[in-house]
Amino acid sequence: MFVLVMICLFCQYWGVLNELEEEDRGLLCYKCKKYHLGLCYGIMTSCVPNHRQTCAAENFYILTKKGQSMYHYSRLSCMTNCEDINFLSFERRTELICCKHSNYCNLPMGL
């Protein structure tokens, strides 16, 4: 009878215990200074975001004379106080994409 009660108590909290274990493991992000079309020009490593950090992908574009954006390269990292935003200057555009929904979510897709 005691074993049955213990099993019932443990089963009640099974989902909560699993969620805590996943949080303890932490999020993993790619880290690369220059990433272009599936290759890291340098060393591809991982980083674990600290407090108030998320995975980040900074995509750099060159602006053509016609005003169109042409993809140049990306920088992958863990970034503090990251927010999705676009920066535009006369010669280039920088797109900052932040994520924390899954491990290695900062890998650019379709570039």
Curated annotation (Swiss-Prot):
Give the principal location in a single coarse category. Answer: secreted
Limits of the UPAR/Ly6 domain: 27-108
PANTHER family referenced in this protein's UniProt entry, alphabetically: PROSTATE AND TESTIS EXPRESSED PROTEIN 2
| Keyword Disulfide bond found | yes
Q: So which tissues is this one expressed in?
A: Expressed in prostate, testis, brain and lung.
List the GO cellular component terms: extracellular space
Q: What does the UniProt entry say about where the protein is found?
A: Secreted
Q: Which InterPro entries match?
A: LY6_UPA_recep-like, PATE2
Paired cysteines (S-S): C29-C55, C32-C40, C47-C78, C82-C99
This chain belongs to which protein, by name?
Answer: Prostate and testis expressed protein 2
Coiled coil, from the record:
none
**Keywords assigned by UniProt, alphabetized:** Disulfide bond, Secreted, Signal
